[in-house]
From Swiss-Prot:
Induction: Up-regulated following stimulation of E347 brain neurons. This is Activity-regulated cytoskeleton associated protein 1. GO terms for cellular component: extracellular vesicle; membrane; postsynapse of neuromuscular junction; sarcomere; synapse; virus-like capsid. One of its GO terms (molecular function) is structural molecule activity. The keyword Transport applies. The protein is evolutionarily related to retrotransposon Gag proteins. It contains structural elements found within viral Gag polyproteins originated from the Ty3/gypsy retrotransposon family and retains the ability to form virion-like capsid structures that can mediate mRNA transfer between cells. Tetrapod and fly Arc protein-coding genes originated independently from distinct lineages of Ty3/gypsy retrotransposons. Its main location: membrane. It is found in: Extracellular vesicle membrane; Synapse. Belongs to the ARC/ARG3.1 family. Master regulator of synaptic plasticity that self-assembles into virion-like capsids that encapsulate RNAs and mediate intercellular RNA transfer from motorneurons to muscles. Arc1 protein is released from motorneurons in extracellular vesicles that mediate the transfer of Arc1 mRNA into muscle cells, where Arc1 mRNA can undergo activity-dependent translation. Intercellular transfer od Arc1 mRNA is required for synaptic plasticity at the neuromuscular junction. It comes from Drosophila melanogaster (Fruit fly).
């Protein structure tokens, strides 16, 4: 049969205080967690430094959208608050445009779609190809810059249009001849391969130019002197034989 444990009044008070403290602590933790959850989603764009003025440029628009999407996620801004505060990020033509279309956007996704639709509409594939093949690599264009620009255009095509091998085929003929002389098409299977080999060529060319400049300066510094009397190279005025001969003849005539 279980035995009852008798507690003194002092022990009973200590037990009650311990239970009360535990209850208060649990309530505080729950309130703090609830406050954190409540505060999450109540952020806004008031401190966001990214802005958009209405430039009709695909890269500019995508950079702006990417920046504000990241800011929204990091700050824990809800879709509702983001939609309410997106006007803070517009200025100039974009601000005027938003005043006219804001009622069309009832969700955050619709607002982003409107920005893309108006300032960066999807280009037809033929136009992208025209821009892609319009310019070849200039002699002074670094291969990194050229490849980045061309790949950005190809990225605007419908997803899955070309694999990487096909994109390399499209790009390879546009490379400057100084790269194609040293890089064969079958030696590169990825853009990483192409860039690595291209950088090696650029580094070697830079070394060649530096050595050529150094050699040119060295030749210039070792250039033989010119006699100011007879204008021939290889000797100076003081040891010019023609001057000495002419001087002897003058003395002889005297």
């Amino acid at each position: 049969m279980a035995q009852l444990t008798q507690m003194t009044n002092e022990q009973l008070r200590e037990l009650i205080e311990a239970v009360r403290a535990a209850a208060v602590g649990a309530a505080g933790s729950a309130a703090a967690a609830g406050g954190a959850d409540a505060s999450r989603g109540k952020g806004n764009f008031s401190a966001c430094t990214h802005s958009f003025g209405g430039t009709r440029d695909h890269d500019v628009v995508e950079e702006f959208i990417g920046n504000i999407e990241t800011y929204k996620d990091v700050e824990g801004i809800s879709d509702e608050n983001a939609l309410k505060g997106i006007s803070l990020l517009f200025y100039g033509m974009a601000s005027t445009w938003w005043q006219g279309v804001r009622k069309e956007a009832t969700t955050w996704k619709e607002a982003i779609a409107l920005i893309r639709e108006h300032f960066s509409p999807t280009k037809p594939a033929y136009q992208i190809y025209m821009e892609f093949f319009q310019n070849k690599q200039d002699d002074h264009d670094p291969i990194d810059t050229f490849v980045i620009q061309k790949r950005a255009l190809l990225a605007q095509l419908p997803s899955g249009r070309h694999d990487e091998e096909t994109e390399l085929d499209l790009l390879f003929g546009l490379l400057n001849i100084k790269y194609r002389k040293h890089i064969s098409r079958h030696s590169v299977h990825t853009f990483k391969d192409l860039l690595e080999q291209g950088r090696i060529i650029e580094h070697n060319n830079q070394e060649d130019e530096e050595q050529l400049a150094t050699a040119k300066n060295t030749r210039g510094s070792k250039r033989t002197t010119r006699c100011t009397y007879c204008s021939f190279r290889g000797h100076t005025f003081d040891n010019c034989r023609k001057r000495q001969k002419d001087r002897q003849e003058e003395q002889h005539e005297e």
